[in-house]
A protein has these predicted regions:
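A eukaryote-biased signal for short, well-structured alpha-helical docking elements
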Residues: 5-7
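Hydrophobic beta-strand-centered segment that forms part of the acyl-chain substrate-binding groove
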Residues: 9-54, 71-75
């Protein structure tokens, strides 16, 4: 899960052009285990922005190092808030989904976030 947060942080801080704090990581769908010696790929994509926060979809894939295709391992969502030098929230640029795939991903990510908040 640390790699999930690391990839999410890298994506969020690049979009925010500065430091961020992790607000939420959840909605994890564990598909299969990572085996010892597997090559692991972690990919984070922006799915939504609010005034100071960013929602991301994070996907983990793994497979053998000898050319076997990578397979899905985990899908989850994460929310980060951009902060200034005093750790106060600061505004981020707006992002809007443009492709049908981006729109569908944004809707799925938001549904996971809403469900997790409702369960609290």
């Amino acid at each position: 899960m640390r790699w999930v947060d690391d990839a999410g942080y890298a994506c969020a801080s690049a979009w925010a052009k500065g430091p961020c704090i992790t607000e939420f990581v959840g909605g994890a769908d564990f598909v299969r285990p990572i085996r010892p010696g597997d090559l692991v790929e972690v990919h984070a994509r922006l799915t939504r922005t609010d005034e100071a926060s960013m929602s991301l979809a994070v996907e983990v894939r793994s497979g053998g190092i000898h050319g076997a295709p990578l397979q899905d391992v985990v899908h989850c969502v994460a929310v980060y808030t951009a902060v200034d030098m005093d750790d106060a929230p600061r505004a981020v640029d707006k992002w809007s989904p443009e492709t049908p795939g981006d729109i569908a991903l944004a809707q799925r990510a938001q549904a996971h976030i809403d469900a997790a908040r409702a369960a609290q």
